[in-house]
Amino acid sequence: MEGEERFHYGIDIGAAAGTEIGCFADGTVTAVGESSSYGKYITVAHEGGYSTLYAHCSRIIASSGASVKEGDVIAEVGETGVATGPHLHFELHEGSQYLNPIYYVSLA
């Protein structure tokens, strides 16, 4: 919320609305939904107890239960939920622990 400091899990990656979002790694889509804060989101379970969350999407392409491969387009960038502009909010989890995605992804 504006004026309130909170720990921010994950990273925000600015991109034009409608930009395709590729899956981080092979996995299975475990949830597709919408919340007031995340807007439209999708979560994917990966081998080894890892999972990823992609939020503020304008459109979700993959469906719950689908098997996806690294790089598959699973959604599109948007600004749904609490967002000040179009971007991808990306989280990486190991079990219930939040990991800093910056150590695991290349933004190049």
Residue ranges and their predicted role:
Residues 1-108:
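Catalytic cores of peptidoglycan-degrading enzymes
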